[in-house]
Amino acid sequence: VPVKWLSMIGKKEKKPVADRPNIDYTIYEEGIYVGYRDFDSHRKEVAYPFGYGLSYTSFRYSPPVVRMESDRIIVQCRISNDGARAGREVVQVYACAPEGMADKPYQELKGFAKTPRIGPGESCEIQIIIPMDRLSSYVPGTGWVVDPGEYTLRIGSSSRNIQQEIRLPGIPGLILPPDGRLP
């Protein structure tokens, strides 16, 4: 599921159109706390977490192996089908960033990969490449910044079903060019 809903939705507030200043444009007043970033950061109960999906089988994640390069992080993990039926799994990698120059949500999706069909008792290796610039946040007056410090990668099948975590100490701080991309 690419979006999340709160478990209990109250009555929708109705306002006349005249009270809305953004008829011809959009004002994003919520900042970075949209969807799962808001729900996960503020520990709100949800009916369906971001990334949620059903399967007729169950999967087990081995501890990940992470390789850091100057411009990217490579995450490898073995996914095993522990159930009685064949199936596929969407493996998602979320990052928890250190405190820095910009306000940040609890975690953000940084990469994902779908396994091939895995039979019962079988497993496969997946690899997810996360470009280093995906760790950046926009800081007004400065630009796109990767804050230095320890990041935690959380690996699972949804934002709330985390199977493995790994800490990455010593991520160097970077200020990216105006386009937000590493050269």
Range-by-range predicted roles:
Residues V1-R88, Y94-P98, P120, D147-G156, ...:
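Secreted, periplasmic, or luminal enzymes acting at the cell surface/secretory milieu
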Residues A86-V93, P105, V139-P140:
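Short, hydrophobic/aromatic beta-strand segments
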Residues M101-Y138:
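Intrinsically disordered, low-complexity Pro/Gly/Ser/Thr-rich segments with frequent PxxP/GP/PP motifs
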Residues P116, I126-I130, Q164-L174:
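Generic detection of short hydrophobic beta-strand segments and adjacent strand-loop junctions
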Residues R134-E150:
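Short glycine/proline/serine/threonine-rich loop/turn segments at secondary-structure transition edges
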